[in-house]
């Protein structure tokens, strides 16, 4: 009798350990956690769901990326936003959020490349326009302060085509200052 009870208890334990939770239930739990802004739980549930479904749900991948970003798992966020981009779900915002995650990882070249790629797909995405313009304005000002006029000029010229009035104005103003300073330096060298 003891062996029978032990065998019964053992089989129940093994069944519970190896039983797969229903993916739809996991997704629902992830959605509930996400809506409650409980991002660690949402990330765990969404990533488990995506693992079970072989990353087939682009919307869940996008929201898992947001949850990963919120819990500062930026590398994982990039991976999930890539899935959303590949499956063409909310592409513009997926590019914008991927870029922000790359920026948090201090991968500046990939950050800029992602913004450029994203702007080709969604040229009116305000977040990408803002981040791209701000990046090149800061880079141009840093180059200008370092005495690298040509590099600064290139940075400012990348901002001008953007549809952001204040960034465009700042870039044009900075280009004007750059030209003025260049002229002043030439004049200074010409007069003894």
Regions inferred by a protein language model and the residue ranges of each:
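Register position in tetratricopeptide repeats
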Residues: 35-36, 70-71, 83, 104-105, ...
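Start-of-helix register in tetratricopeptide repeats
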Residues: 24, 58-59, 93, 127, ...
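Canonical tetratricopeptide repeat
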Residues: 59-64, 97, 131, 138, ...
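N-terminal leader/linker segments that initiate helical-solenoid repeat arrays
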Residues: 2, 17-63, 70, 90
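Short coil turns that delineate tetratricopeptide repeat
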Residues: 54-55, 89, 123, 164-166
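Canonical positions in the second alpha-helix
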Residues: 49-50, 83-84, 117-118, 159
